[in-house]
Each structure stands twice: as C-alpha cells, then as structure tokens.
C-alpha cells in the first residue's frame, strides 16, 4: 500500500497568468502509483460540445485511492477526483444548454457515447464506452 494522506491534496483551482497571456492552472497529478506532485498546466479552451469548469471543491472518494495506487488501467500522469463542484468558465463551440457562471457538478461517470445498445435505449449509466472521471480523463484535484 502506498503511503499518502488525502489531507495533503488541495481541492481548489488556482488560475494564474504567466508572461503575457498564457493562463495556467495548478493540479495534483499522480505520475505513477503513489507518486503525487503539484504541477502547473496550460489552461486550454474547451473543445466542441465541452465546457471548462473552474473547480470550487472536490471530494475525496475511495475510488480515488484506486487511481492513486494504480488499481485501474491508467495512462499516466492523471489528475484524480470525480466528486467535483464548480462553475463553468468557458464554453466550447456548439454548447447551448449551459452558460458561463452556471454552477455544476461532475460525478464518476465521464459521459456516454450515445451509440452503443445501452445508450440507444436511454441507459447511459451502462454505456459500454464511457470514461470515468479521474481515471480515464483528468478529474477535479485541480
């Protein structure tokens, strides 16, 4: 078992401007099982159909320890955290149902494909192609 404590993980986004106009954010990244580091990453614009969220809080869940300990098949590095609350701060093209400033929550399920048998029947929870937040794509320890 890895030696780490969840209490050492910051849960708020710190956005800063470096140089002229290059915005970054800080995150807690796991570069390999049990190896945490605080990193600065570029603040990217959201892609089509996506939103960018400024994290206000992120819970710590037992499944996050699985991410940290390498239990899941993960492409490293990874930012854990799937119990996220924040506000939308940017919209990708084509986004119509959301607004900048709107408070949102992000859970474990990181989306559904919309094409598999389950999705076609409205059963998004059992989508065969979904990615999990903090496991298959970066989470809220940012």
Regions found by a protein language model. Give the residues of each.
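Extracellular beta-rich ligand/substrate-recognition surface
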Residues: 28-36
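Glycine-rich beta-strand-centered segment in the early N-terminal region that forms part
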Residues: 42-58, 68-117, 137
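Phosphate-binding beta-alpha-beta segment of Rossmann-like dinucleotide-binding domains, i.e.
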Residues: 108-142
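Short, P/G- and charge-enriched loop/turn segments at secondary-structure junctions
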Residues: 13-16, 73-76, 130-134
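Conserved Rossmann-like nucleotide-cofactor binding loop
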Residues: 61
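Basic/polar N-terminal segments that are highly enriched at the extreme N-terminus
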Residues: 1-26
């Amino acid at each position: 078992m890895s030696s780490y404590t969840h209490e050492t993980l910051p849960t708020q986004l710190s956005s800063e401007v470096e140089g002229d106009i290059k915005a970054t954010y800080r995150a807690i990244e796991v570069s390999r099982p049990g190896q945490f580091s605080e990193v600065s990453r570029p603040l990217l614009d959201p892609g089509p159909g996506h939103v960018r969220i400024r994290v206000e809080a992120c819970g710590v869940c037992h499944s996050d320890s699985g991410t940290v300990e390498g239990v899941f098949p993960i492409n490293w590095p990874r930012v854990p955290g799937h119990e996220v609350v924040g506000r939308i701060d940017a919209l990708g093209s084509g986004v119509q149902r959301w607004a900048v400033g709107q408070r949102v929550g992000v859970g474990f399920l990181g989306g559904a494909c919309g094409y598999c048998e389950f999705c076609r029947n409205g059963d998004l929870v059992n989508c065969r192609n979904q990615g999990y937040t903090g496991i298959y794509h970066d989470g809220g320890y940012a």
